[in-house]
Amino acid sequence: MSAAISIALKVWGDLACYTIPEAHVERLSYPVITPSAARGILEAIFWKPQIRYELDRITVLKPIRFTSIRRNEIQGTVTVKGASGVNAWMKDPSGYEPYLVDSAGRDDVQGENRTQRNSVLLRDVAYILEARLIVIKPTPTDPPAKYREMFTRRAAQGQCVRQPCLGIREFAAYFAPPDGTETAADENRDLGIMLYDLDFPTDGPVGARPPECALFAPAKLEHGILDVAAMRRNLYRRA
């Protein structure tokens, strides 16, 4: 039997991109952080196998503004395994061959890696994430309040398991506990069908469990507040 307790976190940053699945090449961001991205931020600050997070509400603190940038990106990725992968390079650095962003005119296997892509991003964002911290099997010596105190302490001290990001790894998220003076932006938007989260199987090793499907739901921003609990009541699956 599980038990839950409420937590809240303020996050902000200069740039953010919560990519709409249909626009993953020329990236186009949702106007608001997705529940799955918000959950990822919470897990980046504090995570243990016996807990999980369930978002209830997201408050948008600043007006929604977009910006567009064009960047040089690469068409391929570096492999981990194999004779030319990262693992082999770690064992024998002499065999390291850099993966070049601009290799125009090269005749080897890398070919022409560079490609220019446009991205429509959010700028100057800030949110308050309200969620339930769920303890899977609480005990008298391991209550939910214990984990909330650990989460709040880590958030106040700027500690994290890994650097949380705002949709893309290079867009770092700053975070702190809310101070109670924040006010929601006066934004009202029909966000359409939004990605809620990915559905992972519950059996097998954690690192070897690809998502079975994606979960989507209708989303609406009312006076700067996204009701994630209402989204959860209208989920549908997409393979």
Specify the residue positions occupied by each region the protein language model found.
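N-terminal, Lys/Arg- and Ser/Thr-rich interaction peptides
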Residues: 1-25, 223, 229
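Internal, well-folded beta-alpha domain core
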Residues: 73, 83-239
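Beta-strand elements of well-folded, non-transmembrane domains
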Residues: 11-15, 62, 129-137
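Glycine/small-residue-rich interface belts in oligomeric ring/scaffold proteins
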Residues: 23, 28-72
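Short helix/loop capping segments that flank catalytic or ligand/cofactor-binding pockets
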Residues: 19-20, 69, 139-140
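A short, structural micro-pattern
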Residues: 3, 52, 121-125
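Residue-level detector of short, conserved catalytic/binding motifs and their immediate flanks
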Residues: 7, 56, 127
